[in-house]
From Swiss-Prot:
Biological classification of the source: Bacteria, Fusobacteriati, Fusobacteriota, Fusobacteriia, Fusobacteriales
Molecular-function GO terms, alphabetical: RNA binding
Similarity-based family: Belongs to the NusB family.
UniProt cross-references to NCBIfam families, sorted A to Z: nusB
Transmembrane segments: none
Protein name: Transcription antitermination protein NusB
Known function: Involved in transcription antitermination. Required for transcription of ribosomal RNA (rRNA) genes. Binds specifically to the boxA antiterminator sequence of the ribosomal RNA (rrn) operons.
UniProt keyword Manganese, yes or no: no
Amino acid sequence: MNKNFEEQEKKAKGGVRLAREEVFKLVFGVEATESASEELKQAFDIYLQNSEELIGTLNENQLEFLKSSIDGIAKNYDNIKDIIKKNTQNWAYERIGVVERALLIVATYEFIFKNAPIEVIANEIIELAKEYGNEKSYEFVNGILANIEKSKK
């Protein structure tokens, strides 16, 4: 396991699940409007201004996780999408549901660019897929994440 990721997980009370969910929501908003990565940063700035109540529920480490994830996803947006496209067999990226795309973007960023353990990411992303997607979302997302993991080895 990546030592920095483990430290970040331990420091955040209750882990980073809440922050990860908020990252997903921001990415979902950008994907739903088919915006560019630059708009992810703008959406994040607006989010920070309008979400004082939620921001108050995040501890310092969760907020840092949220900020660094948004920055990292915005910087690597095109690369992340390319990785997902290469690992979706017989699926055009545009045909993937917005919920599933957003979840895959968050998971791919953490796994590839932060070297976070796939087991941790997959478990939380699958839970989010069950909560926000349809009854097949988690299976689809899990399959693509398995392909991404294989391609990284």
